[in-house]
Amino acid sequence: MNQKTINILIDPQIFNEQKFGGISRYYTEIYAALKNKEGVEVNCPLLYTENIHFKESPLFNTSFQKKNAFLINYSKVFRPFLPRKLKKKNAREFISLLKAQEFDLFVPTYYNTDFLRYLGNKPFVLTVYDMIHELFPQYFLEDRDTVPNKKTLMEKATKIIAISESTKTDILSIYPHIDARKIEVVYLAHSIKTASNIKLDLPKKYILFVGNRLFYKNFIFFLRVVSPILKANPDLYLVCAGGNAFNDEEQELINNLNINSQILQKNFLDTELANYYQGAQCFVFPSAYEGFGIPVLEAMACGCPVILADHSSFPEVAGNAGIYFELNNAEDLSNKLNQLLENNNLRTEYKHKGLIQADKFNWQKTAEACLNIYKKSI
């Protein structure tokens, strides 16, 4: 007997909002993994997107590209007005599919609640990536929608996917009335490209920091810790990959610490990121909180030793392959960093541990785990 095909509708919300980012990466990988799976029909009404992850995926190179070749090829010509118009078209197409009710399960990609008015009695599975807005409200004063919208969706969802045990614990700590039985943990993975032969203008010896540097990422704290280490090692640099140019606060502190000549900010392509990791003495991730922490996996997959806080989801991701410091303890971080920089054998040990740990995570596992939860929700 043939198994009944499961029809899953994914909303285009995150692909409209993000040009790149962890959430759109997650849904691109899930969508791509399930798209050609037997017994599964996945639909995401995405008539147009500027999302880089989607454009680099097999989804873009097949039906998406063929159906929208004109828009893709000529969007630069119409750049001033076309994206907004096409995103509205995405929304209209999405609403029409919701109203048609020809699906078994709905998967929202973020926390907009508008779909609820059209959903009827159809089940939906919500992924919760973190509880940053709830735990650090001082950093999101202008965002008045995310917290109440997320709460509403968590209460109404058939199932909730949390991307770490840490995130699940945070959900239940903040909202103890939510049924713990409907929350299941599914780990993410990484999509790091293999290091290429591209020649990058990077120093011979450097510590690596990757991504956003604001607020709970603890970059200012890290700058103060790394400053004396840089001064004691004139041939050592700090490379900040991504995150845009240093802001006024960062630049002022760099000037005051007198370490301008040993700090570089570099923007990168996805195809270059592995080179940054592989060339580094170590990767430092001083963040106070992450729902998961994909950069930790990326670094380990590239054989780059990782120093990170013993907090949040990090022990779940790095396991015994991480070198942990006590959160916000400057002396502890400084000691761990010096130990690693001064000991080649220790770096080699954690390089190998990291490769083994990173190999435990892949998007196929993530997609299969999500699909099992989707099936249980119908």
Regions inferred by a protein language model and the residue ranges of each:
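Carbohydrate transferase catalytic cores enriched for Leloir-type hexosyltransferases
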Residues: 1-378
